[in-house]
Design a protein with these regions (language model features):
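Primarily membrane-embedded glycan-assembly and transfer machineries that use lipid-linked glycans
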Residues: 1-159, 181-302, 306-310, 357-362
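Aromatic-enriched
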Residues: 310-367
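A short, terminal or domain-edge coil/loop segment
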Residues: 172, 218-221, 344
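Contiguous hydrophobic segments
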Residues: 136-145, 163-173, 236-247, 319-337
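Membrane-interface alpha helices of multi-pass inner-membrane proteins
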Residues: 158-171, 175-182, 281-289, 322-328
Length: 367
């Protein structure tokens, strides 16, 4: 075995141990007190069982439940456990989802071995530091999005529609991705997606007839709440350049519209890409123009990062390092938006290179 392989494998193992150790250290340091978002999900699920309204504030940070009803239903099984155990099950399940996502994406592109996959897994743990610290459902959102990607890639258009509510866990993160999914899936995806979503809405109407009013009440309150958190600001362009943003994402509406137009142009420009890379690009473009996003949402860049790593080398491995360093140097705050910009720029470069290789040169006959 070459010395390079031995060193690489030793590095991968060390990196994995360090990533897991740092995760456990973080969780032990905070003692679960910083699981502000998980307190919201867990509390909403408990309210479902109690027959109370889910649209209220929860936890030590008094955060609101700004999601569609079925988000609380997903967490119902966890309510049968104490909070501490439930949060551990939640985190473990999320990490399993990440491992499955990496396995299937790397299997699709091929050329990766178990050490490459392990390296990616450990880097995702680093990247998702804020996610597991506050107890966000980022791993589940990633899993739902990648599930839709593979379902569409296999032309299972009806099933793609059935999975649409998974994208609505955080619809503001999929402004480009969802329209592309509906366009690629055609009327079959649109029909089943609409029926599935309306059915879920109908169930909530039966349980809580005025849930829309309750939800809009919380959203209206969020319009006046600006992102003034000195620690973890939104990872959006508006926050990066100091324009500020509210908790609904409407404070910089004109800028958002411009970014959506740019992101849509990029995806349309490279529509010739195979389905999985194209959808990965659309996921990245969606984060680029998201009106509201946090550093824990950047885990949605993983499909694009794996595509960029298709021909595995030290250079592609360093992309993951660069993304992680930017996140930690920016303290998972507004500067983290640069990770999205970097990944999108690299995706555009790769897509452009693919297009150039596909061009067939025209040779004129000699006179």
């Amino acid at each position: 075995m070459k010395i390079q392989k031995i060193l690489y494998r030793a590095f991968v193992f060390t990196n994995l141990v360090l990533a897991i150790s740092f995760m456990l250290y973080t969780l032990n340091l905070t003692r679960g007190n910083d699981l502000f978002d998980f307190q919201v999900f867990y509390g909403a699920a408990r309210n479902v069982l109690a027959g109370s309204s889910i649209y209220t504030n929860y936890g030590a940070a008094n955060l609101p439940f700004w999601y569609f009803p079925w988000v609380s239903w997903i967490f119902l099984p966890l309510t049968f456990f104490p909070f501490e155990i439930a949060s551990l099950i939640f985190l473990t399940t999320g990490l399993v989802i990440v491992a499955v996502v990496i396995h299937f994406l790397t299997k699709h592109y091929q050329g990766f071995d178990i050490f490459d996959r392990t390296y990616m897994f450990s880097m995702v743990i680093w990247i998702s530091w804020l996610g597991y610290r506050v107890g966000q459902m980022s791993y589940f959102v990633l899993g739902g999005a990648v599930l839709v990607v593979f379902v569409l890639a296999r032309e299972q258009k009806y099933l793609a529609g059935l999975c649409l509510p998974l994208l609505l866990l955080k619809p503001h993160l999929f402004l480009i991705f969802i329209p592309l999914v509906l366009w690629m899936g055609g009327w079959k995806t649109v029909l089943t997606g609409a029926l599935t979503t309306l059915s879920l809405f109908g169930i909530e109407f039966l349980v809580t007839p005025d849930w829309v009013r309750q939800m809009l009440g919380l959203l209206t309150h969020g319009v006046g709440c600006l992102d003034t958190n000195p620690g973890w600001k939104f990872t959006t362009l508006s926050s990066l350049i100091g324009l500020g943003q509210n908790y609904v994402g409407t404070a910089a509406l004109l800028l958002t519209i411009i970014l959506v137009a740019v992101a849509a142009f990029v995806v349309v420009r490279f529509h010739f890409l195979p389905k999985i890379p194209l959808l990965s690009l659309a996921m990245t473009a969606s984060l680029f123009c998201a009106p509201r996003a946090n550093a824990y949402d950047l885990i949605l860049l993983v499909p694009a990062l794996i595509w960029l790593s298709e021909k595995w080398s030290i250079k592609t491995a360093l992309i993951w390092v660069a993304a992680t360093l930017i996140l930690f140097l920016s303290h998972f705050s507004a500067g983290s938006y640069l990770v999205t910009v970097m990944v999108l720029a690299l995706c555009i470069y790769k897509a452009n290179s693919i297009e150039k290789r596909k061009r067939v040169p025209v040779f004129l006959p000699k006179n």
